[in-house]
Amino acid sequence: MEITTLFTDGLFACMAAIGFGSINNTPRSLLPWCGLIAAIGHATRFAMMNSSFHINIILAGFAGSICIGIISSFASRHYRCPYEVLAFPALLPMIPGMYAYGTIQALVCYFQFNSSETPSEHYLNIFAYNAIMTMLIILFMVVGALVGIFASRIFKNFSRGE
């Protein structure tokens, strides 16, 4: 894996996060930070998926969302803004659009070819696979962001000596 592909992936995630952040009325001073957090999280996912280990998208997205959660939690305390202002735009580029699109496409094909002689079980299998993958990826992204929040709070309490 080349560093340029990793940088390009992070750059596109940065642009998407800034776009989502501007739609959601994120303060302009925080938009670059939303982009940077998204680039780090998405590049983490990309590196894990394309490394020699070939980690699947669910676990790689989980690791990327943990990075986003931890960085967003510390940055939100530093900039005195809600956690969601930084984390949600950064998580949105990691939403599995191709799996969601494949789910809807398979469902439409199933209903279109259900009455003909074409075996429609194939489309049901594709629908089930894509729907389960979409739900698992999003579930692990949310859990990863929550793990990031809890980890930063534990670190904060640990550093205080509580």
Feature-to-residue mapping (PLM):
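Alpha-helical transmembrane segments and their membrane-interface boundaries
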Residues: 1-67, 71, 82-83, 105-162
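Ordered, amphipathic secondary-structure segments that act as subunit-interaction surfaces
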Residues: 72-90
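Hydrophobic alpha-helical membrane-insertion segments
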Residues: 85-104
